[in-house]
Structure formats: structure tokens, C-alpha cells
Amino acid sequence: MPLNEVSGNAFPRTVLFDLDGTLLDSAPDMLATANAMLAARGRAPITLMQLRPVISRGTFRIIAVAFPELDAAAIQGLIPEFLQRYEALIGSVSKPFDGVEMMLHALECAGTVWGIVTNKPEFLARLILPLLGWTSRCAVLIGGDTLAERKPHPLPLLTAAERIGVMPTDCVYVGDDVRDIQAARAAGMPSMVALWGYRSHEDNPMTWQADTLVEQPHLLSRPDVWPST
């Protein structure tokens, strides 16, 4: 029996994950960063409830929540400060979502190769890997600035598959944002929505045309939950 077959059900040969909101609950670190910027200006902090729905939308949206009165140019001007402060705080309070380690262990035991494709700047994503013990386990890491394009463009997913040495159709991509699913569909990869991630009230994953929607990470420890590749 091949390594990735268990009781007649197969894990995928390769799985690619989004990072923030899929593998990592990074909202606490980002909240601390935004509130440090507010405190430096003598302003009141924001709450996790305010910030959580936009975490997957990137730094610009996070700053926009913290400083709603600013125009786009002013928000853009604060991005370097946010990234510098975030780099100093990264990993201090964030952790994998419950069930993620169980899932990764099950994949590894089945012989499945896994990697990360995120829109987070690559240097920040690489800082996280050793903190979680993932450096040698993660087969590929593509950040939002690694290539000329980022999600929802398919290039990051296609490049990740190429670097691992598999066809895109042999991969499954798991993410919590509509751009993740758009990128996977454009790359020809089966996709799964991580419903535990960072979504706003306006988001409706049922309309994203993913292959599967999954409620919790631990469910992905079962081979029968995964779409066929």
C-alpha cells in the first residue's frame, strides 16, 4: 500500500497552504503591532474583533482599520512602520490554530509533501518557520513579494508546484480567502476553504467555487476529507 493511502482513502501527494488564517492564527501579533502604532500617537487601541475580519486582506487593510480617517496615500506611507514593528513582535503571541499540528503530522506520516504560499512578505514568513519548528518540514515557501505576481494570480502556486517537482493537478491548495480559491482555480489545483480563518460578514465561501469547505483543521487529519487529485 502506498504511503499516502490509508484504508482505501488517499491523502494528496502535495498540499500547499496559505499562512495567515489557515495555518497560523497571526491576528494577535498584528493586533499588537497596530496598537503599538496607535499608542505611539497617543490613541486608543482597537480590538481583535475589529481587526480579525481583514487580516487576510493584507497590511493596507489592517492599517485602514486602525486609522480609518487616513486616505490611501497616508495608509501606504505607514506600511514600512507597520512591517518594522511587526517584525519585532512576530511570533510573540501568534500560534498555529488548534488541530494544525495534528493535521501536518498526519500528512507527513502519509508521505504527503506540504508547503506555504502566502501574500505575506517572504522575509516575514521565513521568520515564523523556525519559531514553529517548520523550517525543515515546509518543502517550499512563496511569499507575496517572492515573484512578480501574487495571489489571486496563479503564478505563486504554479511556481511552488514546480519547485517541489509535481504537476499542479497533483496539489491541493488550502486557504481562507477568496483570492486563495481564485488562484487555485486559475492554477488548475483542487482547493479547500479553511472556514476557521479570517472572513468578514460579507464573505460567502459557498460562492467561491472551491472543491471543499472544511470547518476545523483537525478534520484534515482524515484522508477521506481531501478532494481527489
UniProtKB/Swiss-Prot annotation:
It catalyses: 2-phosphoglycolate + H2O = glycolate + phosphate. It is an enzyme of class 3 (hydrolase). Its EC number is 3.1.3.18. Gene3D superfamilies: HAD superfamily/HAD-like (3.40.50.1000), Putative phosphatase, domain 2 (1.10.150.240). GO terms for biological process: carbohydrate metabolic process; DNA repair; glycolate biosynthetic process. Pathway: Organic acid metabolism; glycolate biosynthesis; glycolate from 2-phosphoglycolate: step 1/1. One of its GO terms (molecular function) is metal ion binding. Mg(2+) binds at D18, D20, D176. Its cofactor is Mg(2+). HAMAP family: GPH_hydrolase_bact. Belongs to the HAD-like hydrolase superfamily. CbbY/CbbZ/Gph/YieH family. Specifically catalyzes the dephosphorylation of 2-phosphoglycolate. Is involved in the dissimilation of the intracellular 2-phosphoglycolate formed during the DNA repair of 3'-phosphoglycolate ends, a major class of DNA lesions induced by oxidative stress. This is Phosphoglycolate phosphatase. It comes from Xylella fastidiosa (strain Temecula1 / ATCC 700964).
